[in-house]
Amino acid sequence: MDGVHPIAEVLSKAAGGDFPTVDGGWQRVEPWRPGVEGVVAFTGRAYLAVDDDVSDGTLVSLGPDGFGGASSPRLVSRLAGSGWIDSLDIVLVARGTGGEPTLVPRSDLRNHPRAEHATAVRSSVTTFGYAAPDDHTLVTLSRGLGGLTEVGVEIDPAKDHVGADLVRDALTLLPEGEVVVAACAPGNARALRAFLAAGFEPVASVQLWRPER
């Protein structure tokens, strides 16, 4: 699509403390990536990115609203059909810090499971890590939610890196002030604490699916 996607716009505003109106409403938007749909929910407001083979009437009949209805498992399952459904994640935002990067490009990590997952739902995925070839700590940067830069991280369990330090190192890969998003499962408390400690702030939830209707 041309221009800034509505999801990118609302997430960028949220990164600056400007959140959608809390009115219980929802808005339909076009998917930001072909073959991937999703729901992004804020406090009292939701956005459904669904392809045009689903009519407005069908969406309304599923009962979405901004107070949790748009993320209803029944609604998501109906829209996904027999397709893959991702977990319901917390969306966190931060800004790039620029500076001298500690991480280096690591094309050898492209087959890492986290990198493969990123490639399945995002675009322009690049992989970074620390320079030591035996260190499989991974950072992915990609075009993710709404076309914004999205970051994912995973520490090599054989190394003693601190999660928050890795996230901070990832932010140096981005120009100072650039909005970056991350999605984290609520049950992944270790990763969630790392993002929070590195300055990310929770602003919304997201659930993605690849529809097979």
Where are these regions (language model features)?
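Conserved active-site alpha-helix within GNAT-family acetyltransferase domains
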Residues: P186-S205, E212
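Conserved GNAT acetyl-CoA-binding A-motif
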Residues: A46, L174-P186, V206
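Short hydrophobic/aromatic beta-strand element in the GNAT-like acyltransferase core
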Residues: D89-V91, V125-A131, L138
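N-terminal charged segments
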Residues: M1-S87, T102-S124
